[in-house]
A protein has these predicted regions:
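Conserved structural motif at the start of ABC-family nucleotide-binding domains
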Residues: 2-4, 17-19
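The feature captures the beta-strand-to-loop junction immediately N-terminal to the Walker
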Residues: 33-35
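Helix-to-loop junction immediately C-terminal to a conserved catalytic motif
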Residues: 48
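Q-loop/switch helix immediately C-terminal to the Walker
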Residues: 69, 74-93
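Conserved ABC ATPase "signature" region
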Residues: 92-106, 125
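Conserved ABC ATPase signature
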Residues: 110-119
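Hydrophobic anchor residue at the start of the ABC signature
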Residues: 123-124, 162
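Walker B catalytic motif
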Residues: 138-139
Length: 197
C-alpha cells in the first residue's frame, strides 16, 4: 500500500505541491497528470524516498523509480544489466523480461550502444527485474508505438499479479487506473517557478 495524507512536496527548498491525499493498494495504479513544472517528478522523487515530504504523512514501500535517465551500466550487456539489478534485489532474473520488453535480440549488446528507445526499454525492464512497486516518470518517452504497447501489456500483468505502479504522464495512457490532476494542488506558482532558478 502506498498512501499519502495532506502531503506537500518541495523542489529547491520551495513547496511545489500541497494538500495531496491518495491511496494505491496492491494491484492498483495511479496516473499523475499536470503541465510541465507542476511537480510530477518532485512527487515521484518524494514517493521514492529521494526527497523528504515537505509536510503531511506518507506511507510508501521500497519502490523502483525510473526518472529521465536510464540508469544502465553502459559497459554491461543488456542481459548483464538485468541480471545485475535482479541480483541486487535478491531475485533471480526472469528470462521472460527479455521478450516482454523486446530485448531478446539485444541481450548481448553493451547498453552503451543502444538507441534512446532501446535504452528506455532496458531501463523499464531493469525496474521490472527488481520485483518492487514502480514509480515511472514519463514511461512512454522515447518509445515507439509497438514498445509502448508492450510496456502497457506487461504493466497490466504486473498489476494483475498484485504489483503497484504510479506513473507521471503528459499524454493519454491506455491503462484503466485513476488519474490525479496535480494542477489544483500547485503551491504558490511564483514559488514553484523560483524552484527552477
Amino acid at each position: 500500500m502506498l498512501a499519502a495524507r495532506g502531503l506537500a512536496v518541495a523542489r529547491g527548498g520551495r513547496p511545489v505541491l500541497e494538500g495531496l491525499s491518495f491511496a494505491v493498494p496492491p494491484g492498483g495504479a495511479l496516473v499523475l497528470r499536470g503541465p510541465n513544472g507542476v511537480g510530477k517528478t518532485s512527487l515521484l522523487r518524494t514517493l521514492a524516498g529521494l526527497a523528504p515530504p515537505w509536510a503531511g504523512t506518507l506511507q510508501a514501500p521500497d519502490a523502483a523509480y525510473a526518472g529521465h535517465l536510464d540508469g544502465a551500466k553502459p559497459a554491461l550487456t543488456v542481459q548483464e544489466n538485468l541480471l545485475f539489478w535482479a541480483r541486487l534485489h535478491g531475485r533471480p532474473l526472469d528470462p521472460s523480461l527479455l521478450d516482454a520488453f523486446a530485448l531478446a535480440p539485444l541481450r548481448d549488446r553493451p547498453a552503451g550502444t543502444l538507441s534512446a528507445g532501446q535504452g528506455r526499454r532496458l531501463a523499464l525492464a531493469r525496474l521490472a527485474a527488481t520485483g518492487r512497486p514502480l514509480l515511472l516518470d514519463e514511461p512512454l518517452a522515447a518509445l515507439d508505438r509497438a514498445s509502448a504497447d508492450r510496456l502497457l501489456l506487461w504493466l497490466r500483468a504486473h498489476l494483475a499479479g498484485g504489483g503497484l505502479a504510479v506513473l507521471a504522464v503528459h499524454g493519454d495512457l491506455a491503462l484503466d487506473a485513476p488519474a490525479l490532476d496535480l494542477a489544483p494542488h500547485a503551491a504558490d506558482p511564483l514559488g514553484a517557478e523560483a524552484a527552477f532558478l
